[in-house]
Amino acid sequence: VTEPDAGLDTGRLKTFAKKINNGYLVNGQKIWTSTAKIADKILLLARTIPIEECKKNTDGLTLFYTNLDREKIEVREISKMGRAAVDSNQIFIDNLEVPEFDRIGEEGKGFKYILDSLNPERILIAAEALGIGKNALSRAVKYANDRVVFNRPIGKNQSIQHPLAENW
């Protein structure tokens, strides 16, 4: 969903799917696309109606589930410090032909459809972040108890105890 110039403002997406004979011709780019390095398919939200012709900026977006054609989609991995189990990528779409059959639901209603998955995904990501934070805190406590300086664990010092206790 995310694009470099739109961020979380889904209504500002610029990737465009132009209607052609039996489908659509898609051009644009996305960022933070998970598993694009290994995926065979892509879930793609693209504008099919120019934003100027829409009542709301979230109108005119259409959802597709189609083949990730590497002849038409360039995938560049984004380096990350964490969450390395899943690759994150920037993708560049150049004249990708998408059959009409690969459209999900009605044309122009894609934002409504994508919301059904975005809200649960946000909860999942929040739960993941809480788990990562809890694990980091547990490791910090273990380190404070294991690290010995001047013959005593650094966890005996109030300057170490207070931030750990505040975050427990």
Language-model features and meaning:
Residues 1, 25-27, 66, 105:
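General beta-strand structural signal in soluble alpha/beta enzymes
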Residues 4-6, 31-37, 83, 120-124:
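Glycine-rich phosphate/pyrophosphate-binding beta-alpha loops
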Residues 7-11:
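Histidine/acidic-residue-rich, glycine-tolerant segments that coordinate divalent metal ions
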Residues 15-18:
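A structural signal for short hydrophobic beta-strand segments in well-ordered beta-sheet cores
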Residues 21-25, 41, 88:
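A generic structural signal for beta-strand entry/edge sites
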Residues 27-76:
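A short core secondary-structure module
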Residues 73-168:
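Glycine-rich beta->alpha junctions and the first turn(s) of the following alpha-helix
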